[in-house]
Amino acid sequence: MTTKLARFAQKRWISSTTSTSNMYDPRVFRDPVTNVQELRKPLDSDDERNFLFLKAMKSDATPVFYRDHVIDKLIRVCTKDGEKETSRKNVLSALEIIKRRQYKAWAKASEEEKKSIELDPFLVAKKGIKNCHPLMKLQGVTRGGTTYQVPFPIEEPEAEFRAMKMMRDICRVRSKHGETHFKDILATELLAASQNEGSTIQAKQELHKTCEANRAYAHYRA
């Protein structure tokens, strides 16, 4: 039985050493090129991509000008009850509001002030989210029947997710209380965060203060 399985794996280009959840054999598949400039360059004669297969490109890696990894992730984080299209409309509407507000401020500014005003809403949003990245997180650790909130360092992808989640929760609470629409609150929060201001920045600072207060429990990490 084992011999037959090995022969089948060799015929079908399936690796018998890698995880079964990996559909691409690393011996014969390579990552796709998603950069437009790289795609236009000819391959060298000895480039292995001339002889091997390429993996299917992920849907969020499409090399088009209106797609952005951070914005796509924000759309997914803001999705509620599977209504991704509604989330997309809210996020893109927030970016449009940012564009209008920034252009209005730019039109009224002096020539010197115009240089410091960013008109690209994607850059404003990404800067705001970046400023909200927490450096630490609190995680429950049980010792002797007692659970302690222990501060842990945080990796960049999780920091980005937590920044988006904090901003999303703040916007949802404020919109639920009838202050204004979600898209308007999100635009305001992104603009404020790009200047290191706003409720999300305050939430991040409060988290850091709590982590600092709980640093005595840091030895529970091990």
From Swiss-Prot:
Family label: Belongs to the universal ribosomal protein uS7 family.
Key words, A-Z: Mitochondrion, Ribonucleoprotein, Ribosomal protein, Transit peptide
GO-annotated biological processes: mitochondrial translation; ribosomal small subunit assembly; translation
Protein name in the entry: Small ribosomal subunit protein uS7m
Gene3D superfamilies, alphabetized: Ribosomal protein S7 domain
UniProt subunit comment: Component of the mitochondrial ribosome small subunit (28S) which comprises a 12S rRNA and about 30 distinct proteins.
Keyword NAD: no
Transit peptide: 1-14
One cellular-component annotation, GO: ribosome
GO molecular function list: mRNA binding; rRNA binding; structural constituent of ribosome
Places the protein is found: Mitochondrion
